UniProtKB/Swiss-Prot annotation:
Topology versus the membrane: Multi-pass membrane protein
Superkingdom field: Bacteria
Transmembrane segments: 6-26, 63-83, 89-109
E.C. code: 7.1.1.-
Pfam families: Oxidored_q4
Binding partners and assembly: NDH-1 is composed of 14 different subunits. Subunits NuoA, H, J, K, L, M, N constitute the membrane sector of the complex.
Family: Belongs to the complex I subunit 3 family.
Keywords: Cell membrane, Membrane, NAD, Quinone, Translocase, Transmembrane, Transmembrane helix, Transport
Top EC class, one word: translocase
Function text: NDH-1 shuttles electrons from NADH, via FMN and iron-sulfur (Fe-S) centers, to quinones in the respiratory chain. The immediate electron acceptor for the enzyme in this species is believed to be a menaquinone. Couples the redox reaction to proton translocation (for every two electrons transferred, four hydrogen ions are translocated across the cytoplasmic membrane), and thus conserves the redox energy in a proton gradient.
Organism of derivation: Moorella thermoacetica (strain ATCC 39073 / JCM 9320)
Protein name: NADH-quinone oxidoreductase subunit A
Reactions catalysed, as given in the entry: a quinone + NADH + 5 H(+)(in) = a quinol + NAD(+) + 4 H(+)(out)
Amino acid sequence: MVLQQYGIIAVFLVGGAATAVAALATNWLLRPKKPPEGDKLAAYECGLKTQGPTWIQFKVSYFLYALVFLLFDVETVFLYPWAVRFQALGLFAFAEMIVFIGILVLGLWYAWKEGALKWL
């Protein structure tokens, strides 16, 4: 019985690896044979010649918000099973979850205090 369950997992792992290898092999077979040159490597701005430098540096702050979102999204993954089994788990699990949420709120407060969540 246990071997059959591991067999299913092995089939999925082999299938996933085969799909990835097939995608990479197809990409390699269909790629252009000669490297691009000339206008293909030039920056494109609506069909016109570029005006000014094409590579400008700008600050992207989305990753900070994405990181905070990911943190609290993972928190909900841990909170949901606990909430479903709340009555069966008892007071000790409630105290553990309060500590878990407290640590996350403390981290959010620290990031906010340090200015990590400022847009610009």
